[in-house]
């Protein structure tokens, strides 16, 4: 979605981690951590989606709207990006993505961590329109991607009114939302297939 916001086109190569394609020696040469996404930009390689987002807006942004130069604004954006990486994505993986391999969602304790994560996000959004303050930034885009995955697998976002308000707004203004949602629907389909096979 950041690429769309910046008007960039990518030469995408799909790596199927469920089939272990990330362990291909050619991919490991590019990224020894064998994680996705990975960006190769004119010979420069970087991975971890939030690091990629910041790199792209710093290099290709026409202005600093998505990642302001103001150090305090950057600090809040970075905190939200780290929150997304350290809490939001792991709770998604631990509760919902377990179904990719087992056909079963995670434990009740895992679900409580999902709720706690959304409580934090709801608090961040109290009295403001965007996750890192008064303007739309890369933090909104990163967190939108994860919130959409929670949404598609049935997590009740409406219990978190600030998150629900933000989500309804940000998905309307984010370039590439439709492609992101299509990916989220694919996640849902794969989880449902695994759940049906486990019955």
From Swiss-Prot:
<dbReference type="InterPro" id="IPR040079">
    <property type="entry name" value="Glutathione_S-Trfase"/>
</dbReference>
<dbReference type="Pfam" id="PF02798">
    <property type="entry name" value="GST_N"/>
</dbReference>
<comment type="similarity">
    <text>Belongs to the GST superfamily. Delta family.</text>
</comment>
<dbReference type="InterPro" id="IPR036249">
    <property type="entry name" value="Thioredoxin-like_sf"/>
</dbReference>
<feature type="domain" description="GST N-terminal">
    <location>
        <begin position="1"/>
        <end position="64"/>
    </location>
</feature>
<dbReference type="InterPro" id="IPR036282">
    <property type="entry name" value="Glutathione-S-Trfase_C_sf"/>
</dbReference>
<feature type="binding site">
    <location>
        <begin position="48"/>
        <end position="50"/>
    </location>
    <ligand>
        <name>glutathione</name>
    </ligand>
</feature>
<dbReference type="GO" id="GO:0005737">
    <property type="term" value="C:cytoplasm"/>
</dbReference>
<feature type="domain" description="GST C-terminal">
    <location>
        <begin position="70"/>
        <end position="199"/>
    </location>
</feature>
<comment type="subunit">
    <text>Homodimer.</text>
</comment>
<dbReference type="InterPro" id="IPR004045">
    <property type="entry name" value="Glutathione_S-Trfase_N"/>
</dbReference>
<protein>
    <recommendedName>
        <fullName>Inactive glutathione S-transferase D3</fullName>
    </recommendedName>
</protein>
<dbReference type="InterPro" id="IPR010987">
    <property type="entry name" value="Glutathione-S-Trfase_C-like"/>
</dbReference>
<feature type="binding site">
    <location>
        <begin position="34"/>
        <end position="36"/>
    </location>
    <ligand>
        <name>glutathione</name>
    </ligand>
</feature>
<dbReference type="GO" id="GO:0006749">
    <property type="term" value="P:glutathione metabolic process"/>
</dbReference>
<comment type="function">
    <text>Has no glutathione S-transferase activity.</text>
</comment>
<dbReference type="Pfam" id="PF13410">
    <property type="entry name" value="GST_C_2"/>
</dbReference>
């Amino acid at each position: 979605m950041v690429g769309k916001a910046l008007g960039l086109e990518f030469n995408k190569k799909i790596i199927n981690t469920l089939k272990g394609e990330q362990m291909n020696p050619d991919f490991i040469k590019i990224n020894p951590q064998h994680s996705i996404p990975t960006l190769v930009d004119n010979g420069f390689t970087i991975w971890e989606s939030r690091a990629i987002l910041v790199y792209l807006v710093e290099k290709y942004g026409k202005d600093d709207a998505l990642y302001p130069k103001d150090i305090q604004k950057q600090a809040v954006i970075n905190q939200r990006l780290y929150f997304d990486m350290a809490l939001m994505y792991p709770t998604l993986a631990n509760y919902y993505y377990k179904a990719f391999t087992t056909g079963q969602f995670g434990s009740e304790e895992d679900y409580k961590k999902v709720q706690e994560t959304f409580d934090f996000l709801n608090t961040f959004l109290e009295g403001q329109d965007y996750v890192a303050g008064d303007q739309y930034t890369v933090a909104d885009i990163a967190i939108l991607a994860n919130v959409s995955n929670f949404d598609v697998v049935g997590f009740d976002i409406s219990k978190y009114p600030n998150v629900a308000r933000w989500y309804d707004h940000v998905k309307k203004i984010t370039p590439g939302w439709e492609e992101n949602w299509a990916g989220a629907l694919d996640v849902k389909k794969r989880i449902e297939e695994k759940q049906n096979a486990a019955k």
